[in-house]
From Swiss-Prot:
Residues 146-221 form the Carrier domain. This is Fatty acid synthase subunit alpha. Residues 92-107 have a biased composition (Basic and acidic residues). The gene is FAS2. The active site is at C1304, H1546, H1587. PANTHER family: FATTY ACID SYNTHASE SUBUNIT BETA, MALONYL COA-ACYL CARRIER PROTEIN TRANSACYLASE. It comes from Candida albicans (Yeast). InterPro entries: 4-PPantetheinyl_Trfase_dom, 4-PPantetheinyl_Trfase_dom_sf, ACPS, Acyl_Trfase/lysoPLipase, Fas_alpha_ACP, FAS_alpha_su_C, FAS_alpha_yeast, FASI_helical. Residues 92-140 are annotated as: Disordered. It catalyses: acetyl-CoA + n malonyl-CoA + 2n NADPH + 4n H(+) = a long-chain-acyl-CoA + n CoA + n CO2 + 2n NADP(+); a fatty acyl-[ACP] + malonyl-[ACP] + H(+) = a 3-oxoacyl-[ACP] + holo-[ACP] + CO2; a (3R)-hydroxyacyl-[ACP] + NADP(+) = a 3-oxoacyl-[ACP] + NADPH + H(+). CDD domains: elong_cond_enzymes, KR_fFAS_SDR_c_like. It holds the Pfam family Ketoacyl-synt_C. Its EC number is 2.3.1.86, 1.1.1.100, 2.3.1.41. Fatty acid synthetase catalyzes the formation of long-chain fatty acids from acetyl-CoA, malonyl-CoA and NADPH. The alpha subunit contains domains for: acyl carrier protein, 3-oxoacyl-[acyl-carrier-protein] reductase, and 3-oxoacyl-[acyl-carrier-protein] synthase. Belongs to the thiolase-like superfamily. Fungal fatty acid synthetase subunit alpha family.
Length: 1885
């Protein structure tokens, strides 16, 4: 056959085949069955560009033939030509053919260490191992120029940022870009530059065909685009020196590739670009090895890296070089180089090595000396000592706490709500203690605060409110009494004792139990005075002494004198027995009996723990006169447990007089309290659980100013002291906490200097009154033979440096008239216990100070009071002995709790003891009689041994019994008695707001019903955010509770990518649940919190900047560039011709370029004098920011990859926040909006301060650096682009789009614009909110303005990242930047009710304001005060418009007028119809005319009602100078300025803002007459989140909504000490902890932005909106919301488990043909079609869309009535006009049948209203005389026939009147909608 005939036949065959293909159905399934089943084909090959049919064949085999093939032992192979060429042609991999070395060769070859191959940055696919190198020349491969196919494929894939195999050549560019026109334009532009010209419509042509079209004219050379991209790849990702020429030479020498194939390899490298610059040339070669292998695979060639021929090639594993020969070869070169170096040195007159050698020797000698000294020091002092003495003191880290005035109000409020919520039901000791602390902080502001809350306590709500009112009033009265008194330390705690038990299972259990015999400290003092059996001493009586004297004298006396002596002796005895002044044992007993009668503990009846004794609070301020002091009850010959000793020649001995002084002081302190006002005290050793901590509590509760030291300075420690001060700090008290190591001499000196230095020098300027140095460390286990480094260090702390401390204070004391009292911590342990190192020696040595006080010169500046501290349970030193304390007390001595010992020591600070200390040193024995126990060590050892022995026996018996029971009764015998822990399961609810019952709603605001126009009320129906704490739910958990719940932890773990949901086979078994994202191992949901919480907290919130989140930005190495001038010619480098010419263009004569002939590349040499920009790095001091949680990924939510790669990161935050906000509104499909509103009525008013900063960075910085940047980067930088993406991917609306830019106030400004957009009628649904990102550029510029927190300084001050944002505190120092987005869905209340979406809050008011003239853009201003603008003048009475009853009366009058107008208009329609008939002639349709006109009348009536409600409800206050916008907005909901419960502050933590904002809110409240004593809660969210700029107001608004929903007010947990300057703002409370209230009615949100932007929004609880509704409307709404909640709940769970929360729309809800018709019909609505909401032809310009059902029914009735001219009645009633809850009204006007019918309808309110309207219409149709407006209409009954049609039945008077008027029958028509009911009646005569 001739070729031309063959070609013609082939053409015909192809045409026919194609025709058949297009015209016939595809029967591929049948075809597969033929070759798979009939022919049992085992090898199937697809010839085509991609494995399309092969994939289908694989699926078919798996689904249908798997078992079939197994039965027949068929092993099928499905291949595709495009990817399986080697398998098809049976070509082995070249690597498999590489020669393998034999073991013998390996042994004979000298082994060398294997060099670790550096791994290059990850490319798109795994890099295959290169073929082993060969010594011979590589076999060259026939060259082939680049094909257009590959070039186009690479250029498109590179632009799409996808690997080649992800870009099918069968698709057109238009399909590949997925609708992104800018990317499409970029690709076409690149192709144009590459090929010179493009065919027509290349975007619609598949890449295969496009390549064929280009191939005809393609030269095979790389063009401009590809050359530029390759050049950029080499310069940005290859190591220095590895140029294009190097790469080409390597490819040629390594694989024998020619220039064309080299081009192809370089092209393929573009789609496998490394993530980072490769580190070395070896890495680069490895990279190109992999690319070359890929190219070879795609090109169908084999690569070999060794010689293709030659006998030696196969066996050559690499040449072996003789090392000796190599050394000889290089020796001469090294020698020459050395000689040259020496010549140069001589020329420079510099001797090599001499200087460095001398210095080296000196350094070595010095180093040896130093090392010797260090070794000696280490050997002598030990490692522990060396580390222990390191100084830690820093004045910068000091914490000052003095804001008692704020904590007092916080505590009062907490107590108030504790009573209300039943947490506090009786007055116990703790409550009394709280009351004392509150009284200690009483001031006029606090009293007003308490009085307001007690006066407004709603007792009708229950018993707890009554209790709160009663107790609260008592506390107020107490506070008034002590207002002028000094604060006192008064401990009312229960006295406890030790109790040790051994359980049946052998467990030793210790607890502190209340003592029944001693209930309060007054009785405790009495007990201490009595002493015990062990403290009794046998002392001779006076009589016995006289007898001994008499006997001694009488022996030496004469008989006469003996008689005289006997008479004198007898007289003396009589005097002793009769004298009341001489103490005897009997007299002591008598006194004791008298004293114990009224105070016997068993007879005490006024124990404040009893519930009935709440009057204990009332008696707290009373001062008790002590008639009989406790000292008078000290028994004879008994030493009290607590006593004072006096120094005698025999040592220290008990002194009764001094002890009485001390005990009486203790008694007074217990009964009346002890004040420390104006006392300055230093306390060391006051850690948690120590005696010092209890002493510290007492000092600050008594009003002292205390500086306390801590050796373990941390956030946890400072929080401990802050909490202590917040609870116990009294008026005038101050607590200062500093880090301090008492083992460091430097710290001792620095501490004292800090205390005494003047404030201007950075000190306190104090003069100490007392020093309580209790610092110590335990030395347990150190005996005489083990006095180690720790013992020596402990000795230094407890003795050496304690003395230094006293000495330093002495040297700083300014005068001799104010000595500081030092309470020395002595111990009875003088080696008694043993094995405690140098503890005893340290304590004994302190006693030398009693003598030195006399012998040295510091007695006038320091006084000494030794306190021998007894056995104190629970301290760090003694806690191990707790279990034997009970046994010790049974010996007749006393052990003490920490509170008791602190009380004892504080008793040494009474004025009497202080005075005594100034006269002489005082020794206070607080040992509890322990010193009277001989062999204490033996007793303690025996007690411990007995306990352990008992425990062992019981344990053994328990185990034996258990074994016996199991043998007898089986292993499960204990099952019923075993303790089972019920572990909680996660329950992720995604709840909507809880709806109250209608009756509860009506109680809130009964007058509100029907008062507001709901189309002019804007509500928040959805809200969400993306921020440092995840989303709004997880942020609220952290803000409100300070920790994540189990559900919150799961959600955060999911957000951060720690876990994912798995549903399918796992490890060979079906599994449905959470798995660890890294290991793919299952994890139980209850374990998620414990496993991931630490990591979650570490990588969320405010934290150190994580470079991986910000493209590698590390503030510690912030990169900048600096211009330098080149001082000498630089080394040449290689680049492309285009780049070389650009260098030449820039540098001119200072740049040389030359072409490299081999490669066509150019070398460039920068010459002297050229200017270059050289990067440098500085240490930036803003290291901390609020960052999105690490691991946050838009893919987790379902956002497509192409969108992620296209948009700015902030757009992703906005998309996620938007979809979550919609879900929060119950909207699972945004197109649902269009069922209720037109596409033009959904708008977007969200905005940003900066917009896409990542895009801006790319546009300016990266583009300037010539880094790869997408060509459409500009569009992503626009602030409105984020809103555009929301519309393009989710909404497809055509409504208003407004983009506010208000810096930090953007979000609230957005809400303001959104509300205006809705109220102006331009939209009914609007997305509002704000968003901003964090980037280094903004961070740097904020720092330049000194606006942000300096992290370096904060670290110096001991702050952790999470506490660096501290609004309102004394130490606040700049805001903390953050990033994220916040979105709210707002709409009209009317629409929200119709849709049944949740209403989270009502937006009662928004406003923005500028400030005054100035020159500072960021300066804070008070312009927003204008929301409280209101003229007062000398006006005395409020405007009546503020009275809702007045407004309601006016509204009702107006509604009556509208009703009358509507009825009149409807009755005139007949006349209008007659006139219209004449006008339109034959074309006139009576029915159509009446229908349209009726609808117009209805719409006009509705508009008038709306205007009336706006006038008297929504907008009555506007433009009224007497009513402030803020007051008016609240009054619209029947609220007052007192009802704003919370003010959410902008609170940036800057010095200026927090003061300015507090002043603004305070003045706002004051001007509007807020009640005194009623401050708003101040919420300062930014302590937790940082400041996200544009998103700030959105997050605050979300928090405000959550406050309304929960009633919980979150505290500012970083408010460790509120600034004293803020105390003046009495209308603001600054809580530091969350407070659960009984409900918040309204919340104010204020926001301030740079550029004179002030903004405020007020949200009101939705209950006040629901109060506007009637019962049926509310209950119908509740039903809708419940159904929507269930649907959303299901959707959210599916979204999280399937990662499908975000589902991008791919089509608008209308076809292209319907786009414009939809825009042009405002009544067009979507319908559900195949489970999708879409517009259709029938919904556009529909005849049914304008005229409503009511109008049609009414028109029909009117057209019927047109035949008669009399007996017509028309009545119109608003649904809200009929009160169906009024039983009297129903009984008087409706029959039983009517009531039953109406109540059983779907809408009872409408049914009753329609029936009433029908009665009125019938009455009018009868034409009889009215009996007045109040006449009953029960005689007119409206019934329904079998078809439901209304019928009229007349009874009684109505029937008589009808008969009299000649009416035979009355026809009635009723219709209603959700607004009104209309009835038309016609009488038949």
């Amino acid at each position: 056959m001739k070729p031309e005939i063959e070609q013609e036949l082939s053409h015909t065959l192809l045409t026919e085949l194609l025709a058949y293909q297009f015209a016939s159905p595809v029967r591929w399934i049948e075809t597969q069955d033929v070759f798979l089943k009939q022919h049992n084909t085992e090898r199937i090959i697809e010839i085509g560009p991609s494995p399309t049919l092969a994939g289908m064949a694989n699926r078919t085999i798996k689904a249908k033939y798997e078992s079939y093939d197994a039965a027949l032992s068929l092993q099928r192979q499905v291949l595709c030509y495009s990817k399986d060429a080697k398998e098809i042609y049976y070509k082995p991999d070249p690597a498999d053919l590489a020669p393998k070395e034999t073991p013998k060769q390996e042994e004979s070859t000298p082994s060398a260490p294997a060099a670790a191959t550096p791994t290059p940055a990850a490319a798109a696919a795994p890099t295959p191992a290169p073929a082993p190198a060969s010594a011979g020349p590589v076999e060259s491969i026939p060259d082939e120029p680049v094909k257009a196919n590959l070039l186009i494929h690479v250029l498109v894939a590179q632009k799409l940022k996808k690997p080649l195999d992800a870009v099918p050549m069968t698709k057109a560019i238009k399909d590949l870009v997925n609708g992104k026109s800018t990317v499409q334009n970029e690709i076409l532009g690149d192709l144009g530059k590459e090929f010179g010209s493009t065919p027509e419509k290349p975007e619609d042509t598949p890449l295969e065909e496009l390549a064929e079209q280009f191939q005809d004219s393609f030269s095979g050379q790389l063009g401009k685009t590809s050359t530029s991209l390759i050049g950029r790849l080499m310069s940005s990702k290859m190591p220095g020196g590895f140029s294009i020429t190097t790469a080409r030479k390597y490819l040629e020498s390594r694989f024998g590739l020619g220039a064309g194939r080299q081009d192809s390899v370089l092209l393929m490298a573009l789609t496998n670009e490394p993530a980072n610059r490769l580190g070395s040339e070896a890495d680069a070669k490895t990279f190109f090895d992999g690319i070359a292998q890929k190219y070879a695979s795609s090109a169908g060639i084999s690569l070999s890296s060794g010689a293709g021929s030659g006998a030696g090639a196969a066996n050559s594993g690499g040449a072996v070089v003789d090392s000796a020969a190599l050394d000889a070869l290089t020796a001469e070169n090294k020698k020459l180089a050395k000689q040259q170096l020496e010549v140069l040195a001589r020329y420079l007159q510099s001797r090599l090595k001499q200087g460095s050698l001398k210095s080296f020797i000196k350094e070595k000698e010095a180093s040896a000396v130093l090392q010797k000294e260090l070794d000696l020091w280490e050997a002598e002092h030990g490692e522990f000592y060396a580390k222990g003495i390191q100084p830690t003191f820093s004045a910068l880290k000091s914490r000052t706490y003095d804001s008692y005035w704020n904590w007092a109000r916080q505590d009062v409020l907490s107590m108030y709500f504790d009573i209300i919520f039943g947490k506090l039901t009786s007055v116990d000791r703790e409550t009394i203690n709280q009351c004392i602390q509150i009284m200690n902080r009483a001031n006029p502001t606090l009293i007003k605060f308490m009085q307001y809350h007690i006066d407004h306590c709603p007792e009708y709500k229950g018993e707890t409110y009554k209790l709160a009112k009663r107790l609260g009033q008592q506390l107020i009265d107490n506070c008034k009494q002590v207002l002028t008194e000094d604060p006192v330390y008064k401990d009312v705690s229960r006295i406890t004792g030790p109790k040790t038990k051994v359980s049946a299972k052998g467990n030793i259990e210790y607890e502190e139990t209340q003592k029944d015999s001693v209930r309060k400290f007054e009785q405790y003092v009495y007990e201490m005075a009595q002493g015990g059996a062990m403290t009794k001493v046998s002392q001779p009586t006076i009589q016995e002494d006289l007898a001994r004297v008499y006997k001694a004298i009488s022996k030496q006396a004469s008989k006469d004198s003996k008689l005289e002596l006997q008479r004198v002796y007898e007289d003396l005895l009589k005097v002793v027995e009769s004298s009341k002044e001489i103490e005897t044992e009997q007299l002591t007993k008598d006194i004791l009996q008298a004293a114990t009668v009224p105070t016997t503990p068993t007879e005490e009846v006024d124990d404040p723990c009893t519930p009935s004794s709440d009057d204990e609070i009332a008696s707290l301020p009373d001062k008790t006169s002590i008639i009989q002091p406790v000292s008078s009850t000290i028994p004879s010959q008994t030493i009290p447990f607590l006593h004072i000793q006096k120094k005698t020649k025999d040592g220290w001995e008990y002194n009764k007089k001094l002890s009485s002084l001390y005990l009486d002081g203790l008694e007074s302190a217990a009964i009346n309290g002890l004040t420390f006002k104006d006392k300055y005290v230093l306390v060391t050793g006051a850690g948690a659980g120590s005696i010092g901590a209890e002493i510290l509590q007492g000092l600050i509760s008594g009003g002292a100013k205390v500086i306390v030291t801590t050796s373990r300075f941390s956030k946890k420690v400072t929080e401990y002291y802050q909490n202590m001060y917040a609870r116990y700090g009294a008026a005038g008290s101050t607590l200062i906490v500093v880090p301090f190591n008492q083992g460091s001499k430097q710290d001792v000196d620095a501490l004292v200097q800090y205390i005494y230095d003047e404030p201007k020098k950075g000190g306190l300027g104090w003069d100490l009154d007392a020093i309580i140095p209790f610092a110590a460390i335990p030395e347990n286990g150190n005996g005489l033979d083990n006095i180690d480094s720790k013992s020596e260090f402990a000795h230094r702390i407890m003795l050496t440096n304690l003395l230094r401390l006293l000495g330093a204070v002495k040297s700083k004391k300014p005068t001799d008239t104010r000595p500081a009292q030092c309470i020395l911590p002595l111990s009875p342990n003088h080696g008694t216990f043993g094995f405690d190192g140098l503890y005893s020696e340290s304590k004994i040595s302190l006693e030398t100070l009693f003598n030195r006080w006399y012998s040295e010169d510091w007695g006038s500046k320091l006084t000494v009071c030794g306190a021998v501290i007894g056995w104190t349970r629970g301290t760090g030193l003694m806690s191990a002995n707790n279990i034997i304390a009970e046994g010790i007390e049974k010996l007749g001595v006393r052990t003490f709790s920490q509170k008791e010992m602190a009380f004892n020591i504080l008793g040494l600070l009474t004025p009497e003891i202080v005075q005594l200390c100034q006269e002489e040193p005082v020794m206070a024995d607080l040992n509890g009689g322990l010193q009277f126990i001989d062999n204490l060590k033996d007793f303690t050892s025996k007690l411990r041994t007995d306990l352990l022995e008992t425990a062992d026996i019981r344990r053994a018996v328990s185990i034996e019994s258990a074994i016996e029971q199991k043998v007898v009764n089986g292993d499960n015998v204990d099952a019923n008695y075993s303790k089972v822990m019920v572990e909680p399961r996660a329950n992720m609810k995604f709840d909507f707001p809880t709806l109250k019952s209608y009756d509860e709603i009506k109680q809130i605001a009964p007058e509100l019903e029907g008062m507001l126009d709901l189309e002019n009320v804007v509500v928040v129906t959805g809200f969400a955010e993306v921020g440092p704490w995840g989303n709004s739910r997880t942020r609220w958990e952290m803000e409100a509770y300070g920790e994540f719940s189990l559900e919150g932890a799961i959600e955060m773990a999911w957000i951060m990518g720690f876990i994912k949901y798995h549903n399918g086979n796992l490890q060979g078994k079906p599994y449905s649940g959470w798995v660890d994202a890294k290991t793919q191992t299952p994890i139980d949901e209850k374990d998620i919190k414990s496993k991931y919480e630490e990591e979650i907290l570490e990588h969320s919130g405010i934290r150190l900047i994580e470079p991986e989140l910000f493209n590698g930005y590390d503030p510690k190495k912030k990169q900048m560039i600096q211009e330098i001038v080149v001082q000498h010619d630089l080394e040449p480098f290689e680049c492309s011709k285009e780049t070389a010419e650009q260098y030449k263009h820039e540098h001119g004569e200072k740049c040389e370029i030359f072409e490299i002939e081999e490669s066509g590349e150019y070398t460039v040499r920068i010459l002297k004098g050229a200017t270059l920009y050289v990067p440098k790095a500085l240490r930036f001091d803003r290291l901390v920011a609020g960052q999105i949680p690490t691991g946050w990924d838009a893919r987790t939510y379902g956002i497509p990859e192409d969108t992620i790669s296209q948009v700015d990161p902030i757009t992703l935050y906005v998309l996620v926040a938007t979809v979550e906000a919609l879900l929060s509104a119950g909207i699972t499909d945004p197109y649902e909006f269009y069922k209720y509103v037109h596409v033009s009525e959904v708008g977007n008013c969200s905005g940003s301060g900066m917009g896409g900063v990542s895009a801006l960075r790319g546009m300016f910085k990266d583009r300037y650096a010539d880094k790869p940047v997408q060509n459409d980067i500009l569009q992503e930088s626009f602030i409105n682009t984020m809103s555009a993406w929301v519309n393009m991917l989710l909404l497809s609306s055509s409504g208003p789009i407004k983009t506010p830019v208000g810096a930090c106030a953007t979000a609230v400004e957005s809400v303001d614009i959104g509300i205006e957009t809705i109220l102006s009628g331009k939209a009914k649904v609007v997305l509002v909110g704000g968003y901003d990102d964090f980037q280094e550029e903004g961070s740097y510029e904020f720092a330049n303005m000194n606006a942000t927190s300096n992290s370096i300084e904060e670290f110096k001050h001991g702050r952790t990242p999470k506490e660096m944002s501290r609004p309102t505190t004394t130490t606040r120092n700049g805001f903390m930047e953050a990033q994220g987005s916040g979105i709210q869905v707002i709409m009209t209340a009317d629409l929200a009710l119709k849709m049944g979406v949740p209403i989270h809050a009502v937006l009662a008011m928004t406003a923005t304001a500028t400030d005054k003239i100035g020159r500072s853009v960021p300066a804070p201003g008070k312009g927003i005060l204008t929301t409280a603008r209101e003229h007062h003048g000398n006006l005395k009475y409020p405007s009546p418009l503020l009275n809702i009853k007045y407004r309601k009366r006016q509204l009702n009058k107006r509604l009556e007028q509208i009703k009358s107008w509507e009825e009149t208009e409807l009755s005139y329609l007949q006349e209008e119809a007659e006139l219209a008939k004449e006008e339109f002639g034959d074309e006139f349709s009576m029915h159509e005319f009446l229908k349209e006109r009726t609808e117009e009348v209805y719409r006009e009536s509705k508009r008038q009602v709306s205007d009336a409600k706006k006038q008297w409800g929504n907008s009555f206050y506007k433009s009224d100078p007497r009513i402030a916008p803020l007051r008016g907005a609240l009054a619209a909901f029947n609220l007052t300025i007192d009802d704003i419960g919370v003010a959410s502050f902008h609170g940036t933590s800057t010095v200026a803002n927090d003061k300015n904002e507090s002043a603004t809110i305070n003045n706002m409240m004051k001007h509007l007459g807020r009640s005194e004593g009623n401050p708003v809660f101040g919420v300062f969210q930014k302590y937790l989140t940082g400041h996200p700029k544009g998103a700030a107001g959105a997050w605050m608004l979300n928090g405000a909504i959550q406050i309304l929903e929960s009633g919980l007010v979150p505290g500012n947990r970083n408010a460790d000490n509120v600034d004293k300057l803020l105390e003046q703002y009495e209308y603001v409370l600054y809580p530091s902890r969350s407070i659960q209230t009984d409900g918040i009615k309204a919340v104010s949100v204020t926001s301030f932005g740079f550029g004179q932007k002030g903004a405020q929004a007020v949200v009101v609880h939705p209950d006040y909106l629901f109060a506007v509704l009637d019962r049926s409307t509310y209950e119908e709404y509740a039903t809708k919301v419940s159904a929507r909640n269930k649907k959303t709940y299901r959707y959210m769970h599916n979204a999280i488990t399937r990662n499908t929360m975000f589902v991008a729309k791919d089509k608008a809800p209308y076809s292209d043909e319907l786009e414009q018709p939809v825009y042009l019909d405002p009544l067009a609505r979507v319908e559900e079609n195949k489970k999708k909401l879409v517009f259709s032809d029938k919904t556009i310009q529909s005849n049914q869309s304008y005229v409503g059902e009511v109008a049609q029914k009414t028109a029909k009735a009117l057209s019927t009535l047109n035949k008669s001219s009399k007996g017509v009645g028309v009545d119109v009633e608003l649904l809200s006009a009929i009160n169906i809850d009024n039983e009297t009204f129903i009984e008087r006007n409706f029959t039983g049948n009517e009531v039953e019918y109406c109540l059983n309808t779907a809408h009872p309110q409408a049914s009753f209203t329609g029936t009433w309207s029908a009665k009125e219409a019938v009455f009018k149709a009868l034409g009889v005389e009215s009996k007045g407006a109040g006449a009953s209409l029960i005689d007119i009954e409206i019934t329904r026939d079998v078809n439901g049609a209304p019928k009229v039945i007349l009874h009684g008077e109505a029937k008589k009147a009808a008969a009299k008027a000649g009416v035979k029958n009355v026809n009635i028509s009723i219709s209603h909608d959700d607004f009104q009911a209309t009835a038309v009646a016609l009488s038949e005569f």
